[in-house]
Amino acid sequence: MAEEKFSNFLTDIIDADLAEGKVDVVHTRFPPEPNGYLHIGSAKAIFINYTIAKHYGGLFNLRFDDTNPAREGDEYVQSILQDLNWLGADPNGGIYYGSDYFERCYEYAEQLIREGKAYVDDLTREQMQEYRGNDAGKPSRPSPYRDRTPEENLDLFRRMRAGEFADGEKTLRAKIDLASPNMNMRDPTIYRIKHVTHHRQGDKWCIYPMYDFAHPIQDAIEGITFSLCSLEFENHRPLYDWVIRNLFGKEFPKQREFARLNVTNTVMSKRYLRELVEKHIVDGWDDPRMPTLSGLRRRGYTPTSIFTFVKEAGISKADNLVDMRQLEAVLRAELELNAQRRVAVLDPIKLIIDNYPADRCEMFDLPNNPNREVNDTSTRPVAFTKELWIERSDFFEVPPPKFKRLTLGSEVRLMGAYLVRCTGVDKDEAGNVVAVHANADLETRNGNPADGRKVRGTIHWVSCEHCIDAEVSLYDKLFTESNMNSIPDDADFKDYLNPDSVTTVPHAKLEESLKDAKPGDRFQFVRNGYFTPDSKHAGTYNRIVTLKDSFKV
């Protein structure tokens, strides 16, 4: 990915700290939890942290936040590594795992206990919520166990580690400020018991640090200077600062927040996405309708289009909802320049050229990319024979008003080949047209009639003899509701699924040159849109985006 230079409120903060000599190296990180696949919203966090580090000649870490073993696994680790590699976001500061710091986190927890800044609590989760009060005016009250001595707390905490207690029987809480208006500062839990096998540590641990405790410690150990995260962590910043100040006695790392990327007609919640996968509503985490990076990759999106979209969506502290069509517009502009042109007939009907010899096959040179900005003059040979496939929608026996393509007695151009005039049709017993007949003007090999007559319509075609069969998937938005964050709290998000989010075209006919196409190749199917071979199902093509859209950036 090319270096990006930009200015926003985050770079303003960094510029000020650099100018005052508070930091020497800008060091950022991206800390995904390996319990699901990354999505388009994750791309914003990657873009910000990676690009800011690159902009300042600094370091960018990838750290797997695997401190909660319940749903984490190596499948997700590998998918995240693949996504960052695909995006070109090289973690030049290193790849780390939060679980590698478990021993250090434990030692820091004991330090807080010895200093009287943490205690073991026996309250249940429900009791703890009751004792903490709320931010609507209900005051908190201290746990009956808040004044245990450091010696008693150390003994209990070590027994927690030894596995003496059941899940939820005890927690370790930071002793901060029960009167704080910020609920996160009212003696937050920093360790809990979970007798769950960890995907990397096995059964070595049965107590695990909470994110709000582990995260600042990990940042400090790695030398992170700016912990840039999404806006939902803003109220957690005082706790982040408390941990850094009490354990490391310094100002940095510094946490700052930005607004999440919300996109129309989809969901970003891992819980919702996992439900779609586990209930087989979609074809896995990489279903081309999903907002996951693996789904977008399988659909045919490019890393450049995703980072360009994120940049154009803006970096601010104000939440906004970005139209998915903006991403499509960015990609469409890229593919218009870069995608090779090919011919595909999605809904075929046979066109028989009656005056063309049955044993004849001509090769016509069609342009690979006629876009003038590209200056690509290369061509490819396409076979022309007596029997061709054309789009069913390009012929009407009784045409609608202003129809300019093939009808009985009318003449059209066969793209890059001859002019043909329709002479008749074949029908089945039900009266359906099954084949169209025409005569070619064999003097118009270049499409230009000698008498200068005007022919307004041009249609595409492939040879029946020289083509390949394919299944084509035409994708639309996954949900009918534009803003899925606005649905009622008691609503089932699945009720908003779009029943027409995918249409399967089973018997498309593609030009023969596509037999060597590979997943990751992208083509413009002339007049039909942009397509790519599916990475899971051989012989299937996915529509990436349509040729045009009314959306304006």
Which residues are covered by each model-predicted region?
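Secondary-structure transition/capping motifs at alpha-helix termini
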Residues: 19-22, 51-59, 85-92, 220, ...
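Long, charged, mostly alpha-helical binding arms that flank functional sites
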Residues: 253-330
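N-terminal catalytic cores of NTP/NDP-binding nucleotidyl/phosphoryl-transfer enzymes
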Residues: 6-15, 19-82, 197-230
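Active-site cores that bind ATP or allylic diphosphates and position pyrophosphate for catalysis
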Residues: 66-68, 74, 111-273, 331, ...
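Core subunits and conserved enzymes of cellular information-processing
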Residues: 233-237, 241-243, 311-314, 321-553
